[in-house]
Amino acid sequence: MAAGIDDISIYIPQLYLDASDFAHARGLDPEKLERGLGIGQMAIVDTNQDPACLASNACLKVMQKNKLTPDQIGRLYVATESALDESKAMNSYVIGMLEQVYGDDTFGHCGGIECKFACVSGSYALYDNTNWIRAGEAEDKYALVVVSDIAKYDMGSSGEVTQGAGAVAMLLNDKPRLLTFDPKVTSTSIKNEYDFYRPFGKETPIVHGQYSNLLYLIQVKNALTDYKNKVKRTGLIKIKDDETILDHIDYLNMHLPYSN
């Protein structure tokens, strides 16, 4: 059975700080931000918005766009680094807000959790829900996977220029129009490091930027090597002696905190 992303909606707060204004306030070169890092504007939440609010708006957009009703949604996962509570999952807040639109208990049947693992938690949420669909448990229902964050850094820190806020809601089913995930081979790589983390009680992360960039490259290489070994073992791809795994890949979709 196929499984993947059928549609996507994005919600970004209406308030923003122009990157050139930020650069002048911090004594930075605006060209470095706009051309070097690809940053033109920094989204800012209003006083009545939080990550759950952003996620709810993204979900509402994708549901209304596809004319879906709550009974057609079987799962709702939220992936975030901006948790509101140490126990109560953010998806329950999102469901509560959606029920203000669709009615009390209209999402009472909807399973889900909050996922946390820095920037990769959304990928794991996608992985879990595509497997739920492939297993036949969805019963023709959709899964909603939402990534939502308010990224804040210490004032004057190197990470301050990459701040922002927003949410992306991905609608998953067994007949995806946008992207189908390969069910045969998945690879990952993990190591316990302290390049980017946010201890309990701290609103901003502790970041070692250059070290984090290096670790990212190492982990991507390790995951790609593991993927190559798996596809060779399963026979999914036949790699000749004068070829690399990249000769059999049309596109690479990478996570990057900045465009250059």
Which positions does each model-derived feature cover?
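Conserved catalytic cysteine-centered active-site region
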Residues: E31-D50, A83-Y142, S148, N260
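Condensing-enzyme catalytic core mediating Claisen C-C bond formation in acyl metabolism
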Residues: M1-N48, S157-T234, K238
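Hard-cation-handling environments
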Residues: D242-T244, M254-H255, N260
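Cysteine-centered functional microenvironments
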Residues: N48, Y77-T80, F107-Y124, G156-E160, ...
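Phosphate/pyrophosphate-binding loops at sites that engage ATP/ADP/AMP, CoA/4′-phosphopantetheine
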Residues: A58-G74, K221-D250
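Active-site-adjacent elements of ketosynthase-type condensing enzymes
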Residues: D85-G96, Y127, A151-Y153, T186-F200
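Buried hydrophobic positions in well-ordered alpha/beta secondary-structure cores of metabolic enzymes
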Residues: I5-D7, L33, V62, I73-L76, ...
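Short beta-strand segments
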Residues: A79, A143-D149, L171-N173, H255
